[in-house]
Amino acid sequence: MLLWGRWKLAAGLAGLALSLELFYRYMRRRKPLREVLFFPVPVTCIEPVLSPMKQCSCPLPHTDSAFSRLLVQLLGAQRSLELCVFTFSSPSLARALLILHRRDVRVRVITDNDYMAAPGSQIGPLRSAGVAVRHDQSSGYMHHKFAVVDGTVVLTGSLNWTVQAFQSNKENILITDDTVIVKAYQKEFERLWEEYDPATYNFFPEKENK
């Protein structure tokens, strides 16, 4: 019986070692994620990305685009999505965040206080749906434009999340899973998330200075 137990233990350890070796081989073979998206892009149908189970017969072109690839990256989130963006008025991107929120993916948004109430802003609807949103409380702009997916992928560049940015402006987004870069952006998000905690807001700064 003792010999049988030792044999089972040895077999288990051998299996674990083999699994780890296969995992490490896979990681070595896996190509790093390095993609750059450029805008503007033509208007195309994004329903196959947002609602893959539904058939769409709209007249828009059903082709791949930088915008659809951006949506694919965001909707690939399994655990978390951290978004830091200056202005957010794209209904399609708001819809993507709500899809993630309903999947119980933790979605957190940081934005600029001067622009979050602008006409067409999606911040109000996101908050109403239960998405966690925080904003700055300073005279300077919260001008970041980046997202961190599952703590493993970062999307960053010049792009604001507006229809004009996607369809009219010359913009770019870099997508990478470089560990050093992702950690830096994750750290910056967490720093701002704590800094913009509503519990620490000073709503009467003029009284404090007297």
Curated annotation (Swiss-Prot):
UniProt xrefs under InterPro entries:
PLD-like_dom, PLD_domain, PLipase_D/transphosphatidylase
CDD domains on file: PLDc_vPLD6_like
Q: Which residues form a coiled coil?
A: none
Q: Which cysteines are joined by disulfide bonds?
A: none
Keyword Transmembrane helix appears in the UniProt entry: yes
UniProt cross-references to Pfam families, sorted A to Z: PLDc_2 (PF13091)
Write out the topological domains of type Cytoplasmic.
25-210
Q: Where in the cell is it found?
A: Mitochondrion outer membrane
What's in the keyword line of the UniProt record?
A: Differentiation, Endonuclease, Hydrolase, Lipid degradation, Lipid metabolism, Meiosis, Membrane, Metal-binding, Mitochondrion, Mitochondrion outer membrane, Nuclease, Spermatogenesis, Transmembrane, Transmembrane helix
What is the enzyme's main class?
hydrolase
UniProt cross-references to SMART domains, sorted A to Z: PLDc
Domain PLD phosphodiesterase: start-end pairs: 138-165
Similarity field: Belongs to the phospholipase D family. MitoPLD/Zucchini subfamily.
Q: What is this protein called?
A: Mitochondrial cardiolipin hydrolase
Write the lineage as a comma-separated list: Eukaryota, Metazoa, Chordata, Craniata, Vertebrata
